[in-house]
């Protein structure tokens, strides 16, 4: 069995965590160093991760998450944010390649023009959906890397967006795509894995039918 296959098969959405377990700073650093390689449209890197380990702030989050107990027992709660205006930072992202001669001035100008045309031409709804779409790709990669480091996770959308935004003073240009609880799963309370559709029910080739 390949290591990736093993990680995918062992990853579960943990509903119960062992309370009081601390995640070393070293683990967070190693996870996020790998996560830098996640994909994003035009490499403009929409994602921002707000890591909450402070017990007081976690309890505030728990209240905003309708008192879900796993927010209390998790070692950390990660808010995964997507920047709707990430495209406006594209010049900074690509300037290094221009300065190093990896990209010509013509290619640089054309790339920046294409990015601006895409995001500004399609408007605010597209900017929002792109922030969520790209950040969700990143979040899945985060959970796989965390599992590889021995940590369990659970993606969540059951929380009051406005309350969470207010608690952490999150700027309006950031969408809260999801929340991830993280820690060591209490596997004694684990439920059986839910039913999964056969491949033939969710995969088709060359046409939908």
Where are these regions (language model features)?
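Acidic, surface-exposed loops and disordered segments
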Residues: 1-209
